């Protein structure tokens, strides 16, 4: 093995966002661009010699090339073992599961999540730490600092790994283990949920489920778990083959982009349960027949019905939600007498709460839900959670949610997404608006009196770290809110 040291120079645009570094594929295809970020990541970590690294991605265009580069750089930087999903594939939840199960030092996940893929689409990379969760801000800031001073990177001069062959291979002094990307995750799901009850539900001819994988990573996971293990009808999983361009679609599971599923769920022949996941498998949308469940209501209903699921039947330690998520989960936490934490958007902010057992279930406004079973949000886990609730309660989705509203009240909101706006214009709008905030407190807007106006700041109750400028908030005396924030996941 020959380790090469390649001279390079910094790129000024490599600051990680809410969930890693996301740019157009053409940006990542620049000479040294990916390598600079990977080396800057390794340099931000403590001694990696002899450690294990998990590597995988959502299968979008540029994924396999990036996996090969990362493996060669990991070998050059001293890792002794790499665990890689077959064909370079791992959903983000599965990657978190694998990191935790095999006690890896960390992992590199290749995904731009719900963003479009293909040669003209987006690509992304992020580092997850040993607990399986996204790197906290202290590490991402160190990575960014390194990208601004990098002068060289290390890579082994060796051939490519055969990513399609399960088993062990050698790359320099590093062992590369190619694993089934679904197996470990499926085993974890079987430990959490009552698979027998769900299997019985799915065998009932009156019950039908449709799962839209949107030509992204969750297709193989859905087919194996829903159809092969739990016995759902063949064809339950639609758009189930991962494509490098996601079928030229936008794999964001919402009412706009999951149109095929939504049209079926609001038809006369609607299945009992409809669900969709996104590019890397960490988001979910839940639908009943002619009924849409908002992300915040989904989290609230899941928390209120935790006793239906074996892994959570002994109770929840707490609930955590992102600041823009509606306050529906707060009502459940109050009734259960447990903590409810409000964090900035970004799953990395839930990690400390989960590790410290201050929260069991977490959710955010962009169709993300998860729990302490891993340290990422988890789309298919949420679908199985709803199936478990339906199997126990033997009611429809609409009946369960409407009964929830009767008990806890209903939180209404509307969300408006403004996409592909030039970032400088969006930032200036936010700056100008915030400048007016001091004069708004005490005023009435549309008949509602403003009680506070601020830029959300979060103090982590576990490590006391402070995250500022996490979104503009206008709060009213009746408890209603107006929230504005810049996306940290767009390109």
PLM region spans:
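Positively charged, low-complexity intrinsically disordered leader regions
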Residues: 1-36
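Gly/Ser/Thr-enriched, mixed-charge loops and adjacent short helices
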Residues: 2-11, 32, 121-269
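Buried hydrophobic positions in well-ordered alpha/beta secondary-structure cores of metabolic enzymes
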Residues: 19, 55, 95, 108, ...
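Short glycine-rich or small-residue beta-strand-to-loop segments that form or flank ligand, phosphate
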Residues: 24, 52-58, 126-128, 208-212, ...
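Glycine-rich phosphate/diphosphate-binding loops that line cofactor/substrate pockets in enzymes
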Residues: 38-53, 195-205
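N-terminal small/polar loop signature for handling phosphorylated ligands or for N-terminal nucleophile
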Residues: 54-121, 224-286
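Phosphate-binding and adjacent anionic-ligand microenvironments
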Residues: 271-273, 277, 286-289, 310-491
């Amino acid at each position: 093995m020959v380790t090469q040291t390649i001279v390079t120079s910094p790129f000024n645009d490599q600051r990680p966002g809410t969930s890693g570094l996301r740019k157009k594929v053409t940006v990542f295809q620049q000479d040294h661009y990916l390598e600079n970020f990977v080396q800057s990541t390794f340099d931000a970590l403590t001694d990696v010699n002899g450690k294990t690294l998990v590597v995988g991605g959502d299968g979008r265009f540029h994924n396999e090339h990036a996996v090969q580069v990362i493996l060669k750089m990991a070998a050059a930087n001293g890792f002794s073992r790499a665990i890689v999903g077959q064909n370079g594939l791992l959903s983000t939840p599965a990657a978190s599961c694998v990191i935790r199960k095999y006690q890896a030092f960390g992992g590199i996940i290749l995904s731009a999540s719900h963003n479009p893929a293909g040669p003209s689409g987006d690509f992304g990379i992020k580092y997850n730490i040993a607990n399986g969760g996204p790197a906290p801000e202290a590490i991402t800031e160190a990575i960014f600092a390194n990208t601004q001073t990098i002068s060289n990177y290390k890579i082994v001069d060796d051939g490519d790994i055969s990513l399609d062959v399960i088993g062990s291979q050698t790359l320099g002094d590093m062992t590369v283990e190619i694993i089934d990307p679904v197996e470990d995750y499926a085993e974890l799901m079987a430990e959490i949920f009552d698979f027998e009850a769900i299997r019985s539900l799915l065998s009932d001819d009156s019950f039908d489920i449709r799962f839209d994988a949107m030509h992204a990573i969750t297709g193989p996971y859905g087919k194996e778990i829903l159809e092969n293990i739990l016995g759902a009808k063949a064809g339950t999983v639609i758009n189930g083959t991962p494509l490098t361009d996601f079928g030229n679609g936008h794999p964001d599971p919402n009412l706009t982009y999951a149109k095929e599923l939504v049209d079926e769920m609001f038809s006369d022949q609607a299945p009992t349960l409809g669900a969709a996941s996104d590019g890397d498998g960490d988001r979910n949308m839940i639908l009943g027949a002619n009924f849409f469940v908002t992300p915040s209501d989904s989290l609230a209903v899941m928390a209120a019905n935790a006793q239906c699921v074996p892994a959570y039947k002994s109770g929840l330690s707490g609930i955590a939600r992102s600041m823009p998520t509606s306050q529906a989960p707060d009502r459940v936490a109050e009734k259960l007498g447990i903590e409810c934490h409000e964090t900035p958007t970004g799953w990395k902010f839930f990690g400390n709460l989960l590790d410290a057992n201050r929260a069991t279930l977490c959710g955010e406004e962009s169709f993300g839900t998860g729990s302490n079973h891993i340290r990422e949000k988890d789309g298919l886990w949420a679908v199985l959670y709803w199936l478990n609730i339906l199997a126990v309660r033997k009611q429809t989705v609409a009946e369960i949610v409407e009964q929830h509203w009767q008990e806890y009240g209903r939180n209404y909101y509307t969300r408006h997404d403004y996409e592909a706006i030039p970032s400088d214009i969006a930032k200036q709008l936010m700056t100008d608006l915030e400048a007016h905030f001091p004069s708004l407190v005490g005023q009435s807007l549309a008949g509602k009196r403003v009680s506070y106006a601020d830029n959300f700041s979060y103090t982590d109750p576990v490590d006391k770290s402070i995250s500022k400028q996490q979104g503009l908030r206008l709060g009213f005396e009746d408890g209603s809110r107006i929230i504005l924030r810049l996306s940290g996941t767009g390109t």
